Amino acid sequence: MEKVKVVGFTMVKPASPTPSNTIWLSNLDLFATWYHVPAIYFFRPAASIATPSAADLKLSLSRVLVPYYAFAGRFTSSPDGRREIKCTAEGAYFAEAVSELSLDEFGVYTPSVENCRLLVPAHGSNPSDKNEKSTLFFSFS
């Protein structure tokens, strides 16, 4: 088996209707470099708590996208070229992957760049978002 194998892609939409509007990015955001910031978090499950499934996380994400509806939108530009988020409720990108590696084998405290790339969804890896303008990418392994 590969170190990490992607087994599914989904767009997780908000659990209930959200406002349909456009939000300008702040002036600070306009001067920042335009790219997604990868972040990886590892959690060892507590013995008394059941390990969440991908379905559990998708349900939680859909509920969170209601008050934080901009994350279900898409980056775009206004007619005059200003960057903004169009709140479309299209959803957040969710990739599900499996691995036979333990956290220790993966190198949790000192992961290699190669291993990190296996877990972070990259632009172009989302087949349902051809324009690569999603505001939020998730990967569950």
Protein language model regions, located:
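Non-catalytic N-terminal regions of enzymes
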Residues: 1-141
